[in-house]
Regions:
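Conserved donor-binding/catalytic core segment of Leloir-type glycosyltransferases
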Residues: 200-223, 229-234, 242
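Short hydrophobic beta-strand element within catalytic cores of glycosyltransferases
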Residues: 305-308
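Nucleotide-activated donor-binding/catalytic signature segment of Leloir-type glycosyltransferases, i.e.
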Residues: 252-270
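Acceptor-binding helix/loop patch of EC 2.4 sugar-transfer enzymes
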Residues: 61-70, 116-153
């Protein structure tokens, strides 16, 4: 009998952010052994076939800005999800819930005897709050993030209620253990990349005779953009530092002089990320707090060595192999790494080759296959140790 996995994503399925990650996992987990259905408020231009999709909202609400109906959309999606799970109380169906699923829904699933898996797209909120509070304090700013004590407590209760938790980063695992989540609940996992999304040979940027370093993602304090600006300026490397993403207002206000340098370029949202990466020599990502840093996997797939942090390394970047993994506040280490990438082309190329080779094991099809096996093993009563081996062999 084919097992069923019902996925609850309390957000529109748009192919961006967490919905992209969820969709790519669902698409490749679906198969003869495991039937996957994703419950969402609505979809927009993103197919995850052969996985199934259940849209909770009626068609006439599809074009209403989601911020105006998000409370209703989330409630309706969770209600439909619970109705479906109550119909499948034969042990062949599991629930896989994503962040922002309500505690009430998780408890209702447990009361119905349903096994619940939970995704972590970031570290435990308690850990994230500590990291971000300190980051803003260092910059002389008040905390400009949205994590409060109430949300930390709510997430802790959800984590206590679920059966298993997918951890896409070793730092995520550590953060959960620090907050008392039982080790046996933790399932080491990763995110991945899609080679089809990066095929081609076009370049987004014109050639440059110096080193091209790229940063992709929200240009914000959490992702260490201000640190990279400082390290780049102090490295005195000849070349260009290119940021691609939306910018946090305080970064523009407080580090405007560094952003205005002739060797710094800021781009808004980039649709051709492959073209951006093909224009670059190095991927730099001094992120302070992260779950599964998808951009790191994608950069590696495009053959870019990384200079990043333990948070930004994910399961793919190993220190002195696919790049450098450094403490985000290690200014001397970061400056030295940037200088080495500029001066030692042979070592940089060796790291680039290693990154491209290692990325082959993190294509979405392989990532999802490992996840599917973890779910099936749990449903069959396999030991937790067996759930760990496929991924640990890669890192």
């Amino acid at each position: 009998m084919t097992a069923s996995l019902n996925v609850l994503l309390p957000a529109p399925l748009t192919g961006r952010g967490p919905s992209y990650t969820c969709g790519m996992l669902a698409r490749s987990m679906h198969g003869p052994e495991l039937s996957v259905t994703v419950f969402v408020p609505r979809t927009r231009g993103f197919s995850i076939a052969p996985a199934q999709v259940h849209e909770a909202l009626p068609f006439w609400l599809k074009r209403v800005p989601y911020r105006l109906i998000n409370a209703y959309g989330d409630r309706k999606t969770e209600s439909d999800f619970l109705d479906e799970m109550r119909l499948r109380r034969n042990g062949s169906a599991c629930a896989y819930v994503w962040p922002d699923t309500s505690l009430a829904t998780v408890r209702a699933l447990r009361d119905a005897g349903v096994t619940v898996f939970r995704e972590m797209i970031n570290c435990h909120r308690g850990t994230a709050k500590i990291i971000l509070d300190e980051a803003y304090k260092r910059t002389g700013l008040p905390p400009l993030h949205s994590i409060d004590d109430r949300s930390v407590e709510n997430e802790q209760r959800v984590l206590q209620a679920v059966d298993q938790v997918f951890c896409p980063n070793a730092c995520v695992e550590s953060s959960l253990l620090e907050h008392g989540v039982e080790r046996h609940k933790l399932l080491p996992a990763s995110y991945g990349w899609d080679p089809a999304r990066f095929k081609g040979d076009s370049k987004l940027l014109p050639p440059d005779d110096g080193l091209t370093v790229v940063f992709a993602g929200t240009i914000c304090t959490r992702k260490g953009a201000h640190l990279l600006l400082d390290y780049w300026a102090r490295s005195k490397v000849r070349g260009r530092l290119v940021f691609a993403g939306a910018i946090e207002p305080c970064i523009r206000e407080k580090w405007g002089s560094l952003l205005a340098r002739d060797d710094v370029q800021v781009m808004d949202y980039v649709s051709d990320v492959g073209g951006l990466y093909r224009s670059a020599d190095v991927f730099a990502f001094p992120t302070l707090e992260e779950g599964g840093p998808q951009v790191t996997y994608e950069a590696a797939g495009c053959g870019l060595p990384a200079i990043t942090t333990p948070m930004g390394a994910g399961r793919i970047t190993r220190h002195d192999r696919e790049g450098f993994v450094l403490d985000p506040y290690d200014d001397k280490g970061w400056i030295s790494a940037l200088q080495m990438m500029a001066e030692d082309r042979s070592k940089r190329q060796a790291m680039a080759d290693a990154a491209r080779e290692h990325a082959d094991a993190f294509q979405w099809t392989d990532v999802a296959k490992r996840r599917r096996q973890q779910i099936l093993d749990h449903m069959s009563g396999a030991t937790p140790e067996r759930n760990r081996t496929p991924l640990e062999a890669l890192v």
